[in-house]
Amino acid sequence: MKKYETVIFDLDGTLLYTLEDLTKATNYALRRMNMPERTLDDVRRFVGNGVARLIELAVPEGTAPEVFEQTLAIFREYYDIHCNDNTKAYDGVIDLLRELKADGYALAIVSNKPDSAVKELAEIYFEGIVKVAIGESAG
């Protein structure tokens, strides 16, 4: 008898390599706001606590709240369209998930990435494998 019935995964850096698309979206927003761009390594250090925190760390210190909000909105708009330009599943992940599903586990993704991107990426990479995919949403 299985001890657990459901396995819940994070998305970024766990199932999918998303760093390049996050970096490109960050730099697109920064460029649009005439701010200095960030390196891949910068963005790697900034991710993990949601996109608002990513942009908060990416904008120059002392950025006015309304400018931060505008930068975040630009990021979200760009990333919503470009969240899968360079993203890819880590080697072996899809096979592992299929095996877990075949063993009777319900699989889910919970992420602080925007909900629309989580659902889109889950559908692209894990359709028919992952039962539920939930991301950050307003409210």
Regions found by a protein language model. Give the residues of each.
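Helix-loop "lid/cap" segments that line or gate small-molecule binding pockets
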Residues: A29-L30, G50-A64, L121
